[in-house]
């Protein structure tokens, strides 16, 4: 997709919110606002999708097999999930979680962020959503947080979730439940093999929208910015007429 001027400013954080475990990223030296690595999706195809609204009042959980939509574009495998989030509430923290299915399979998410005109603004590949070990209140999962600061005039942002042919060739090594239990109670960790989850086009994905930035750490230079402030994508002139998603 040919890069147009975007109207979204991005603040990026390498950590999660205080309420969830810290994430170790596989590769933090990438620039999310560089969307050239993302699949090229025609605007007309994006306009055919039904964008499910998600706000900070309640997380949205969707299953690819039942809630996914077809998007026949090179570089995208299987169905996609399409969400819209409010862009007029200040800085947004989007927590994306992909649950591991019975320790055998998992959906490896990629996320393309689009501004209110459906112009690509940021791309978060699957490496941005690393494996998280199970905890007291959480199961095995792939998870990451995307921190976005929409430019003035934005009303909505669009979140496209998909996987790729390359991701389907990979697997994720999990933590064996016996090891997790031993680790949790402080016992010696048994020397047993860990299960391996294959990557599939199906899975359960949860998207949470938050405006709580008390624990955020701005790390612009880590992602290729030359300053500590928010990374601005495109210009912040008055926006053109926004795309109106179908009701």
PLM feature segments, named:
Residues 24-51, 172-247:
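Activation corresponds to long, low-complexity, non-globular regions
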Residues 103-110:
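Short coil-to-beta strand junction motifs in C2/discoidin
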Residues 1-25:
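Gram-negative bacterial Sec-dependent N-terminal signal peptides
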Residues 81-84, 117, 122, 136-149:
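Exposed aromatic-hydrophobic patches
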């Amino acid at each position: 997709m040919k890069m147009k001027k975007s109207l979204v400013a991005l603040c990026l954080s390498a950590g999660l919110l205080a309420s969830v475990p810290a994430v170790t990223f596989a590769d933090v030296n990438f620039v999310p606002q560089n969307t050239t690595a993302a699949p090229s999706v025609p605007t007309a195809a994006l306009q055919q999708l039904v964008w499910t609204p998600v706000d900070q009042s309640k997380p949205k959980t969707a299953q690819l097999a039942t809630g996914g939509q077809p998007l026949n574009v090179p570089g995208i495998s299987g169905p996609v999930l399409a969400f819209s989030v409010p862009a007029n509430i200040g800085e947004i923290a989007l927590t994306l979680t992909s649950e591991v299915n019975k320790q055998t399979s998992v959906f490896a998410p990629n996320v393309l962020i689009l501004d209110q005109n459906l112009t690509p603004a940021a791309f978060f590949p699957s490496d941005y959503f690393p494996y998280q070990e199970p905890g007291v209140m959480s199961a095995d999962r792939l998870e990451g947080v995307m921190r976005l600061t929409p430019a003035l005039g934005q009303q909505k942002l669009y979140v496209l979730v998909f996987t790729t042919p390359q991701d389907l060739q990979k697997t994720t090594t999990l933590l064996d439940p016996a090891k997790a239990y031993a680790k949790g109670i402080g016992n010696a960790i048994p020397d047993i093999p860990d299960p391996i989850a294959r990557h599939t086009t199906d899975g359960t994905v949860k998207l949470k929208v938050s405006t709580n930035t008390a624990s955020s750490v701005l790390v612009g230079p880590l992602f290729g910015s030359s300053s500590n402030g928010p990374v601005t994508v495109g210009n912040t002139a008055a926006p053109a007429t926004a795309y109106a998603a179908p009701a």
